[in-house]
Amino acid sequence: MKILVMNCGSSSLKYQLINMENEEVLAIGLAERIGIAGARVKHEASGKEKVTIEQPMENHKTAIKIVLEALIDENYGAIKSMDEIAAVGHRVVHGGERFSSSVVVTDDVKNALEECSDLAPLHNPPNLMGIEACQEILPNVPMVGVFDTAFHQTMPESSYMYALPYELYEKHKIRRYGFHGTSHKYVAMKAAEILERPIEDLKIIACHLGNGASITAVDGGISVDTSMGFTPLEGLVMGTRCGDMDPAIVTFLMEKEKIDHNQVNAIMNKQSGVYGLSGVSSDFRDIEVAVKEGNKRAQLALDVYYKRVKKYIGAYAAEMGGVDAVVFTAGLGENSPETRKSICEGLEFLGIKIDNTKNNVRGKETVVSTDDTPTKVLLIPTNEELAIARETKSLI
């Protein structure tokens, strides 16, 4: 069984074709600049050279046609016919309260996704465009929606409700939803597998640390709390996002800087985080170089970042009544030994202690804590595409 996984953005489309018999990636690629000049598809099939296909793509439907043609091309394709595609799994950012698990896409599901678009105006519309374009081109192939928010629908009310007038929740569904759920679920399950313990017996804190970042408390295999909230802005300090802050700052800035809500949103989402603090970059590699050169603001950015992650780890250990494993994943979590070390320093009271030799590794599935500590620290590369493919396979 071969499953095509798609992640549609506003002007891009990432894809993987996976053979589910052995979970081998048969092809991987990216369509970019959809709807604008310079559109192209970067495509690579297993065992073949990378190719770049430069061709106008007026919309997602055109892009998907080009991707499918690349997949069956006799020179650089991965399959002989589109008939080999058993299903398409789509990443969908926001499922609201409606979807607590992945679903086969129907007209009813598409209508519900449109209703959720107010909650994720930048992400859900292109996700839906990708689904509809695939349905037109592959009308007999099942489509499955896999939601970033679904894993967190198990959170109790005490975790997801804001202390605002309850009527605002009833009227506008203002509550905490959480994101990165597919990644958090994948690494939590993988941690249980590595530790050779039932997931039902484990209290896991999963740290997804990329340019966007979130932490989830996973108790017995279910999400009981997570750092992102109504939007992906809440929680940790990120590459360009501020994370937690006093909400009164919003109206203060509007008054003092004479700016509107869109401009404040841009500041909080695109000009803040380690980029705003350091004045250097949103890329942690650049910030680490600046620190070595003696840049104090770059050091401050890292200090604030590490402290915020530590606070959440401590809070979630308290919430779950302990912690058996802390997992680091995503770009920074997987590839920065210094980040893992700095976050874990001072957490010995939770049974957390890094082994510096074991920790000196990047992008490899491994345990990086000392052998004698009760709480295990793991590095687990996330694989959201495989997780989406597995969810898709389970539904068809």
From Swiss-Prot:
Catalyzed reactions per annotation: acetate + ATP = acetyl phosphate + ADP
GO cellular-component term (any): cytoplasm
EC assignment: 2.7.2.1
Residues at the active site: 148 (proton donor/acceptor)
Cofactor(s) of this protein: Mg(2+); Mn(2+)
Positions with a binding annotation for substrate: 91
Pathway field: Metabolic intermediate biosynthesis; acetyl-CoA biosynthesis; acetyl-CoA from acetate: step 1/2
Residues engaged in binding Mg(2+): 7, 384
Source organism, top-level taxon: Bacteria
Residues the UniProt record annotates as site (Transition state stabilizer): 180, 241
Residues noted as binding ATP in the record, renumbered to the chain: 14, 208-212, 283-285, 331-335
A GO term for molecular function: ATP binding
Biological processes, Gene Ontology terms: acetate metabolic process; acetyl-CoA biosynthetic process
Cofactor note: Mg(2+). Can also accept Mn(2+).
Keywords from the UniProt entry: ATP-binding, Cytoplasm, Kinase, Magnesium, Metal-binding, Nucleotide-binding, Transferase
Main localization (coarse): cytoplasm
Role, per record: Catalyzes the formation of acetyl phosphate from acetate and ATP. Can also catalyze the reverse reaction.
Family: Belongs to the acetokinase family.
Subunit structure: Homodimer.
Protein's name in the database: Acetate kinase
